[in-house]
Amino acid sequence: MEILPAIDLKNGFAVRLKKGEMNSAKIYSDKPWELAEKFADLGAKWLHIVDLDGAFAGEAKNAKTIEKIVKSTNLKIEVGGGIRDEERIKFYKNSGVSRFILGSAALKNPEFVKQMAKKYKIAVGIDAKNGFVATEGWAEVSNIKACELAKIYADAGVEAIICTDISKDGMLSGVNVKFSEEIAKSSGIKTIASGGVKDLSDIKALKQSGKIYGVIVGKAYYEGSIDLKEAFLIAK
């Protein structure tokens, strides 16, 4: 099972939010590229980056910072937040990004996502509030169930689905294993769990499930409630 440490960017700083609320941002670093180096030293293979400003604005706002992070590390990097067209994917690809996360586009423009999946390594980001898909930086909640959206991409050639339970995100309240399993079952696609990881017990629960490909760890690391080195050992 892969563990993907997370860097969420707001105005060039590494921050964490609670339940996706921008006014809850807590700054953890003004040099996010140094965090990337630290994660590599701890044993990470992947890094999960979200341009929070981009997610709300629908365009890349932290592109220069992301470029600097990519140049500072040999980690494979996936990026999401504000990717709505192929030009942005090309820009990030040329910067050295490995995988591109399409969230709002996955709900609003599935044909675009399917086309991009034929050309690039695409992860579909499915973020849910009470089981329903939320978009535009989680500011809008649709009437589409997360599992129904996952099914749409079953044979589309996307590389992974990243599923987030928004009610858990940034709360250190424990990961929603059942939700992640349902997404994996609905889609048959490698599923990465996100939101709520609090300690090593969450890593163990996801690993024991046997159905989850990966997990994103953010606030638990920044707040010191998880030993990442130990987490990588458990996930192996």
Swiss-Prot record:
Name one cellular component (GO) term: cytoplasm
Segment forming the signal sequence: none
| Pathway it works in | Amino-acid biosynthesis; L-histidine biosynthesis; L-histidine from 5-phospho-alpha-D-ribose 1-diphosphate: step 4/9
What does the UniProt entry say about where the protein is found?
Answer: Cytoplasm
Q: Does the keyword RNA-binding apply?
A: no
CDD domains named among the record's database cross-references: HisA
GO BP terms, alphabetized:
L-histidine biosynthetic process; L-tryptophan biosynthetic process
Q: Which UniProt keywords apply?
A: Amino-acid biosynthesis, Cytoplasm, Histidine biosynthesis, Isomerase
Active site at 8, 127
Catalytic activity reported: 1-(5-phospho-beta-D-ribosyl)-5-[(5-phospho-beta-D-ribosylamino)methylideneamino]imidazole-4-carboxamide = 5-[(5-phospho-1-deoxy-D-ribulos-1-ylimino)methylamino]-1-(5-phospho-beta-D-ribosyl)imidazole-4-carboxamide
Q: Name one GO molecular function term.
A: 1-(5-phosphoribosyl)-5-[(5-phosphoribosylamino)methylideneamino]imidazole-4-carboxamide isomerase activity
Q: Which domain of life is it from?
A: Bacteria
InterPro entries reported for this sequence: Aldolase_TIM, His_biosynth, HisA_bact_arch, Isoase_HisA-like, Isoase_HisA-like_bact, RibuloseP-bd_barrel
In short, the EC number is: 5.3.1.16
**NCBIfam families, from UniProt?**
1-(5-phosphoribosyl)-5-[(5-phosphoribosylamino)methylideneamino]imidazole-4-carboxamide isomerase (TIGR00007)
Family listed: Belongs to the HisA/HisF family.
> What name has this protein been given in UniProt?
1-(5-phosphoribosyl)-5-[(5-phosphoribosylamino)methylideneamino] imidazole-4-carboxamide isomerase
